[in-house]
Amino acid sequence: MNPRTVQPLDVPPLYCPIPPEIHPDLALIEKRSIDWFQGFGVFPGEAGRALLRGWQFPALAARAYPEEDAERVRIVADFVHWTTFDDVLIDTDHSHVDDVLPGAPPDLLAVATKMVRMLEVPDAALLPGDPWIRSLMDLRRRLGTIAAPEQMARWTGAFREYLLAATWKRFCRQARRLPSLADYVTMRTADGGVQMYVALSEVVGGYRLTDRDLATPAVRAVTEMALTLIAWDNDLFSHYKESLTAGPCINLIDVIAGERGCSLEDAVPVAVAMRDRVMCRYMAVRERTERDLGVAARRYVRSLDRWIAANIDMSATSTRYTNPLNRPATEMPRARFTPARTDLPSDDSPLALPFPDIAWWWD
């Protein structure tokens, strides 16, 4: 890939009043997770190991689950490593995976459908046993030994939702067309894939949620807000990386710039204001409703808090975003996100954002 000449954008600190936490066994979780991933032949050798360590995916899991069993936290770290498949499947970025999978699947919808079906029926070998499929099915097997059937069904449903939204994003890239901002808001919450990690919270934590717990309007609202915050924050952190790949950059910043007819630099504070307003609403709804929830639902909401904070704290120093092509500083500029947090929102308006599918969060 011939990288474009791109300068990283200045991203201001993000409002997040949730304190940072981290698992005391991070070093062990990281070692075992990278060993597991490299065991399938991906990111081989010391160079691959250094790249994975710089990305800090085990730290994301360790920050999201700072008190849970280390081996269960490692399953999440393994899964986050696996989702680098997104680079090939959705973003058609092969800059660091050419040695494993030389091209994106020609029919994403067919691949996605078969992949989900294999999670539902693990004995059905519907796709070739390449390293990505073998590692995914290993995760499925391990989860099946500790998760209840309804928990596996929720995780598989979250996986399906992610791949459906990802198909939309892939279409936009292939059509070289930016979606409208309203459509992007609808797409991005699911396309972020975080629902697949969050769906594992009860498994990692060793508790059981009921369908009623998750269907409660307040829990639905904070879940959707958390997923949206993480997705939009990822857009801010990953913009430099995405801008270096071929095709249009389907990112909140670019969509705002395209819709408003402004520069990318001017779109950044608009994106930050949007996420800050959602962060304010998240905290208000969360604090108002937590006392009315049962023990399991309270633990689940606490995991949402930690995911929001973990994503910011990991992303701010991950070389996946600061040095996406893994080049010396003399060859490629670095993105910098320090400080990553602020105690003051850039927009604390109590009014709903003007998008019909999320306005109900302010009801």
UniProtKB/Swiss-Prot annotation:
Record function comment: Diterpene synthase that catalyzes the conversion of geranylgeranyl diphosphate (GGPP) to bonnadiene. Cannot use geranyl diphosphate (GPP), farnesyl diphosphate (FPP) and geranylfarnesyl diphosphate (GFPP).
Lineage of origin: Bacteria, Bacillati, Actinomycetota, Actinomycetes, Pseudonocardiales
Domain of life: Bacteria
Effect recorded for Y184F: Retains 10% of activity with Mg(2+) but is inactive with Mn(2+)
Protein family per UniProt: Belongs to the terpene synthase family.
Keyword Transferase: no
EC category name: lyase
Record Pfam families: Terpene_syn_C_2 (PF19086)
Residues involved in Mg(2+) 3 binding: N234, S238, E242
Pathway: Secondary metabolite biosynthesis; terpenoid biosynthesis
Molecular-function annotations in GO: metal ion binding; terpene synthase activity
EC number: 4.2.3.223
Protein name from the UniProt record: Bonnadiene synthase
Cofactor: Mg(2+)
Catalysed conversion reaction: (2E,6E,10E)-geranylgeranyl diphosphate = bonnadiene + diphosphate
Positions that bind Mg(2+) 1: D93, D98
Binding site for Mg(2+) 2: D98
Cofactor note: Binds 3 Mg(2+) ions per subunit. Mg(2+) can be substituted with Mn(2+), with a loss of approximately half of the activity.
